UniProtKB/Swiss-Prot annotation:
Residues 61-76, 137-160, 225-278, 324-379 are cytoplasmic. Disulfide bonds join 113-188. Residues 1-40, 97-114, 179-204, 298-303 are extracellular. Belongs to the G-protein coupled receptor 1 family. This is Gonadotropin-releasing hormone II receptor. Keywords: Cell membrane, Disulfide bond, G-protein coupled receptor, Glycoprotein, Membrane, Phosphoprotein, Receptor, Transducer, Transmembrane, Transmembrane helix. The keyword Transmembrane applies. The keyword Disulfide bond applies. Pfam families: 7tm_1 (PF00001). Its main location: membrane.
């Protein structure tokens, strides 16, 4: 029996992190470290290295002081928090998954079981809530570009606070279960925490809504408002502004080209969220309503679907890198446009001055001629 046959997600790591994670121990046949699990561990290590390097680079990039800015840009602050959430996934979820697949059973103490399951779910919540905060901020930046952005810190605090509170039940639901017999076996599961199966299903569905449905719905509403606002006739009419309008920007983040790149980045984050987590949660829903699916789905497929979820953390730094390059290109074009506009204004001023000099010379010469004629007539 492979290490993945005992869990709804096909792994001893307990991908069903909000409920019955881990390998069930009721059966007579214990799980093993299968070939599919070995491949999964190898891929997880690759994702860990890429995610850790990328998100640490993003965190360093967005937190270092910018000499051209008096205060940090809201966009940089948001992606600093998103990088922190991805690092929490990287350093909690990925090592836990790889180690648990290798050891097959739980080798740590009960307190470690409860704490790690709490941190794992908190990491998943934060990685789901912070893209929502980014979507709300982009909506405010597009609909009210000159408005106050003081609410960003409150939204970030709410996202982290909810992640902490919603993950607290893990501390009480998870515990270690020991199996006596010829081969002792210990696992970190929720066995015995729910008196009836419907209670466990209700908890799973509640967490599914908070982790996937609510963030997806909130982001869809935000970007729908943005698309409707951008596509409205008034917005299109006002979009053809002269280059001098950039001088009215109160910060680099409020400039139209930066808002456009930030909006594109936020949309890409939404798409990666959907592509990475939809297969993961669909498999979970299937298991909750049809537990016999464990015998119908190959373990290799379950491994692949879970790795799709882990892929989200390494992708975010790549998207931020593309955003940074786009902003730098837009900033260079903005500088060129501003310099060209300044040169054009100087040329117009010089031409106007020359014309004024020519007019003044003409008037002076005419005045001198009239004075000479008057003198001759008098003689």
């Amino acid at each position: 029996m492979s290490a993945g046959n005992g869990t709804p997600w096909g792994s001893a790591a307990g991908e069903e992190s909000w409920a019955a994670s881990g390998v069930a121990v009721e059966g007579s046949e214990l799980p093993t470290f299968s070939a599919a699990a070995k491949v999964r561990v190898g891929v997880t290590i690759v994702l860990f290295v890429s995610s850790a390097g990328g998100n640490l680079a993003v965190l360093w990039s967005v937190t270092r002081p910018q000499p051209s800015q008096l205060r940090p840009s809201p966009v940089r602050t948001l992606f600093a928090h998103l990088a922190a959430a991805d690092l929490l996934v990287t350093f909690v979820v990925m090592p836990l998954d790889a180690t648990w697949n290798i050891t097959v059973q739980w080798l740590a103490e009960d307190i470690a079981c409860r704490t790690l399951m709490f941190l794992k779910l908190m990491a998943m919540y934060s990685a789901a809530f912070l893209p929502v905060v980014i979507g709300l901020d982009r909506q405010a930046a597009v609909l009210n570009p000159l408005g106050s952005r003081s609410g960003v810190r409150k939204l970030l605090g709410a996202a982290w606070g909810l992640s902490f509170l919603l993950a607290l039940p893990q501390l009480f639901l998870f515990h270690t279960v020991h199996r006596a017999g010829p081969v002792p076996f210990t696992q970190c599961v929720t066995k015995g925490s729910f008196k009836a199966r419907w209670q466990e299903t209700t908890y799973n569905l509640f967490t599914f809504r908070c982790l996937f449905l609510l963030p997806l719905t909130a982001m869809a509403i935000c970007y729908s408002h943005i698309v409707l606002s951008v596509s409205s006739p008034q917005t299109r009419k006002g979009s053809h502004a002269p280059a001098g309008e950039f001088a009215l920007c109160r910060s680099f983040d409020n400039c139209p080209r930066v808002r456009l790149w930030a909006l594109r980045l936020a949309l890409l984050i939404l798409l990666t969220f959907i592509l990475c987590w939809t297969p993961y949660y669909l498999l979970g829903l299937w298991y909750w309503f049809s537990p016999t699916m464990l015998t119908e789905v190959p373990p290799s497929l379950s491994h692949i679907l879970f790795l799709f979820g882990l892929l989200n953390a390494p992708l975010d730094p790549l998207l931020y890198g593309a955003f940074t390059l786009g902003c730098q290109r837009g900033h260079q074009e903005l500088s060129i446009d501003s310099s060209n506009e300044g040169s054009g204004r100087m040329l117009q001023q010089e031409i106007h001055a020359l014309r004024q000099q020519e007019v003044q010379k003409t008037v002076t010469s005419r005045s001198a001629g009239e004075t000479k004629d008057i003198s001759i007539t008098s003689i």
